[in-house]
Curated annotation (Swiss-Prot):
Claim: RNA-binding is one of the keywords in the record: yes
Protein name (record): Large ribosomal subunit protein uL3
InterPro entries referenced in this protein's UniProt entry, alphabetically: Ribosomal_uL3, Ribosomal_uL3_bac/org-type, Transl_B-barrel_sf
Subunit text: Part of the 50S ribosomal subunit. Forms a cluster with proteins L14 and L19.
GO cellular component, one term: cytosolic large ribosomal subunit
Function: One of the primary rRNA binding proteins, it binds directly near the 3'-end of the 23S rRNA, where it nucleates assembly of the 50S subunit.
Keyword annotations from UniProtKB, A to Z: Ribonucleoprotein, Ribosomal protein, RNA-binding, rRNA-binding
One protein family per Pfam: Ribosomal_L3
GO molecular function, one term: structural constituent of ribosome
Chain positions covered by the region annotation Disordered: 127-164
Source species of the chain: Chlorobium phaeobacteroides (strain BS1)
Length: 209
């Protein structure tokens, strides 16, 4: 098991052994630093808090400055907690975690925040087919249709598919494969796409299956 924080750089394509172009995502994973070690005695569970990036101290609140100073590391941009089982390593506060914990061919799960699409109607958001394109139809082409009768059920059921804000949610993609590890640049090349926009932070964890 292994886990790390990374920043999505963008997408590219790599040719496989069969000379077929495969879409890949490039992630700058680390170096990360252990900002806190949580133990059963103090916190009731075992976990590692990882920090990535480096921020100016003036931009960080005083309590956070003290938190990072206690670990002997610079303030980070993003802090995420991973269970000890997910990490699969015995780490100390302040120690570094690099991409070298992964190798090519490893199966991973990547979690991030999907791209926000803004307000979307039911056709785009839920793949509704829309109204009939027939004679007399004027404005029902992309409408949701009935969402609850006046007399029965005389209400709209909770969870009814309607227009609304689309995207911008936490998404986890499973069954991805690491194609290449570039330790000197702290880069992971992962086959396929991962959630999020460019420069957004993602969590990479070894697949449990």
């Amino acid at each position: 098991m292994a886990a790390i924080l990374g920043k999505k750089i963008g997408m590219t394509s790599i040719y496989n052994a069969n000379r077929e172009a495969e879409p890949c995502t490039v992630i700058q994973a680390g170096p990360c630093f252990v900002s806190q070690v949580k133990t059963t005695e103090n916190d009731g569970y075992e976990a590692y808090q990882l920090s990535i990036g480096e921020r100016k101290e003036a931009k960080v609140s005083k309590p956070l400055r003290g938190h990072f100073a206690k670990a002997g590391i610079a303030p980070g941009y993003k802090v995420v907690e991973f269970g000890k089982d997910d990490m699969g390593l015995d780490l100390e506060q302040g120690s570094a975690v690099s991409v070298e914990i992964f190798s090519a061919g490893d199966a991973v799960e990547v979690q991030g925040v999907s791209k926000g699409k803004g307000f979307a109607g039911v056709v785009k958001r839920h793949n509704f087919s829309g109204g009939q394109r027939t004679h007399g139809q004027s404005d029902r082409l992309r409408a949701p249709g009935s969402v609850g009768g006046a007399s029965d059920p005389s209400r709209t059921f909770k969870g009814t598919k309607m227009g609304g804000r689309m995207g911008g949610k936490t998404v986890k993609v499973k069954g991805l494969e690491i194609v290449k590890v570039i330790p000197e640049s702290n880069l992971l090349v992962i086959k396929g796409s991962v959630p999020g926009v460019k420069n957004s932070y993602v969590q990479i964890v070894s697949s449990k299956k």
